[in-house]
Curated annotation (Swiss-Prot):
The keyword DNA-binding applies. Pfam families: HHH_5, Rad51. SMART domains: AAA, HhH1. The keyword Transmembrane helix does not apply. It comes from Methanosarcina acetivorans (strain ATCC 35395 / DSM 2834 / JCM 12185 / C2A). Keywords: ATP-binding, DNA damage, DNA recombination, DNA-binding, Nucleotide-binding. This is DNA repair and recombination protein RadA. Belongs to the eukaryotic RecA-like protein family. Transmembrane segments: none annotated. It comes from the Archaea. GO terms for molecular function: ATP binding; ATP hydrolysis activity; ATP-dependent DNA damage sensor activity; damaged DNA binding. ATP binds at residues 107-114.
Length: 325
């Protein structure tokens, strides 16, 4: 990544640079992946000037050009894999949850979506030898489901699993939680997460996991009826691309939980469908469908992936956390 300062970009003076930083565009890379209209509004400049600044940023950060497949393959080696803590689940995911991607967990209430999210928030802090990414966590909580007590239980579970002394307090200090009160606030928190991630990166505690639990709760409550659908999807599209951008900028896993609905015209098969429509379907890199089974058992199905076949894994949600069945 380039170390060019914002002020060094053509057309960006100290005043413009300050406005960009206030809006969360702290690096040349962040400017390079912005849209001209977004930058123009933020910095109070014309769109043509914004487009020139973005082009300069892309050249400085070496972003946005064409490259050959072998170079893409080489760059893919930087992608990390975060263990789920379950062998069968990891194997289905090709080694774990990928960085620089959005992984969607959808299912009915009680299917284990929030439990998986909590487990990942613990696992990501482990070293790479134990399947972690040595990173911090940011959680955008829309339904007040984050429970520090559950994190403590899971850390104790890992202590027993690996025979290590792990301090739950230390794990909790590396989890940064913000409660989102409406959809606008939820989108704004992604910008705040970018600022926080930049600060933590400088402190040597890079963010390797961003969780949104749950993605659609506020959008469903605020946009009721077909007449509001276009506005909702437009706003949701912006939100999803903000999450994708975060994953790319910080080489982080982005995990979103999602609610479901029953499709009334489905006469055969499972009528359960994730909400959010095609916007979420196209933007999520991996889609996982969680279902309840007997007792602690949960069935996790990989429904969509650009590189992996469909598959199922059976896990157990126990007091100690997510384990193999």
């Amino acid at each position: 990544m380039s170390e060019v300062a914002l002020e060094e970009l053509p057309g960006v003076g100290p005043a413009t640079a300050e406005k960009l930083k206030e809006a969360g565009f702290n690096t040349v890379e962040a400017v390079a992946v912005a849209s001209p209209s977004e930058l123009a509004t933020t910095a109070e400049i014309g769109e043509s000037t914004a487009a020139k600044i973005i082009n300069s940023a892309r050249q400085a950060a070496d972003i946005g050009g064409f490259e050959t497949g072998d170079l893409v393959l080489e760059r893919r080696k930087l992608v990390g894999k975060l263990t789920t803590g379950c062998v069968e689940f990891d194997e289905m995911m090709g080694g774990g949850i990928e960085t620089q991607s959005i992984t969607e967990l959808y299912g009915e209430f009680g299917s284990g979506k929030t439990q998986v999210a909590h487990q990942l928030a613990v696992n990501v802090q482990m070293d790479k030898e134990h399947g972690g990414l040595d990173g911090s966590v940011i959680i955008i909580d829309t339904e007040n489901t984050f429970r520090p007590e559950r994190i403590t239980q899971m850390v104790k579970g890992l202590s027993e699993k690996y025979g290590m002394e792990l301090d739950p307090e230390e794990f909790l200090q590396n989890i940064h939680v913000a409660r989102a009160y409406n959809s606008n606030h939820q989108i704004l928190l992604v910008d705040s997460a970018t600022d926080l991630a930049n600060e933590l990166k400088e402190m040597g505690k890079p963010v390797r996991l961003l969780i949104v639990d749950s993605l659609m709760a506020h959008f469903r409550a605020e946009y009721v009826g077909r007449g509001t659908l276009a506005d909702r999807q437009q706003k949701l599209n912006k939100h999803m691309h903000g999450l994708l951008r975060f994953g790319d900028l910080f080489n982080a896993c982005v995990v979103v939980t999602n609610q479901v609905m029953a499709k009334p015209d489905a006469f055969f098969g499972d009528p359960t469908r994730p909400v959010g429509g095609h916007i979420v379907g196209h933007t999520a890199t991996f889609r996982l469908y969680l279902r309840k089974s007997k007792g602690e058992k949960r069935i996790i199905r990989l429904v969509d992936s650009p590189s992996l076949p469909e598959g199922e894994a059976v896990v157990a949600v126990t007091t100690a956390g997510l384990t193999d069945q």
